[in-house]
Amino acid sequence: MVNTYLMFGRYSSNALKTASAARTRKAEHIVGRFRGQIKGMYAMLGGNDLLMIVDLPGIEEAIKVYAGLTKLTGITFTSYPAISVTELDRLMQEVANI
């Protein structure tokens, strides 16, 4: 089973200074090392600077990716598990008669 995580990042000033395509490739490698796949990566304005949508096997891999990315980049991440609305609909059907 694959789990989707939304990883919101906030850059420190040093993390922003060291941003580069090479660092992005290293970040992609960290996700892959823990059997994950990046579904999307977006720069943002506002309270968060970065959004990564990542598929990972489980919470242990999500924690390892979080720690690895933070160590590599200096970016502080807040991660949330997510499910599709289709999956939510299926779950709600299972509890419809409760």
Model-predicted segments: where are they?
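Short S/T/G/P-rich N-terminal loop/turn motif that feeds into the first structured element of a domain
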Residues: 1-33, 37, 45-48, 89-98
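Alpha-helix boundary/interfacial micro-motifs
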Residues: 20, 27, 52, 63-66, ...
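Generic structural signal for residues in well-ordered beta-strands
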Residues: 38-41, 77-79
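An amphipathic, aromatic/His-enriched active-site/gating alpha helix that lines ligand/cofactor pockets
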Residues: 56-86
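Short, well-ordered beta-strand segments in beta-rich or mixed alpha/beta enzyme
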Residues: 5-10, 42-67
